[in-house]
Amino acid sequence: MDNAPPEVRNHVFIVEDSAPIRERLGALLRDIEGVSIVGEAGSVRAAVEGILRTRPESVVLDIQLLDGSGVDVLREVCPKAPEVVFVVLTNHAHPQYRRICMEAGASHFFDKSTEIGKVREVITGLGATRH
């Protein structure tokens, strides 16, 4: 029997201004085999610096942040790290926000109040495609 830890196939960075929600997302994602949380941030500045430093495969991103918007993160990071998959998870799931986020480089856009389970599905799927 092989007792080696599972291979990490998806390094994830979480960007969320609410610490309790960040913790909940971390717990939800850490439970997925092959996923490793490589960083967390609650502000635009910390998110941009952390994402560019850790180069995760995917980022779970809120729109409302302590010092600005998740759209600012998308506009700053996507040109520098186009390989990163951004999954926007927000309470502001209006069509105009969806359009703006997708145009700025997001790959997925979900409503935090009704679609949090879809984040798990996407992150699981990303890990499954990387082996």
PLM regions and their residue ranges:
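Short amphipathic alpha-helix used as the core "switch/output" element in two-component signaling
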Residues: 71-81
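The feature encodes the CheY-like receiver
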Residues: 66, 94
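Non-catalytic signal-transmission and effector/linker regions of two-component phosphorelay proteins
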Residues: 1-11, 117-131
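Active-site beta3 strand of CheY-like receiver
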Residues: 54-60, 65
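Conserved acidic carboxylate
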Residues: 16
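Acidic catalytic/metal-coordinating carboxylates
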Residues: 43-46, 69-72
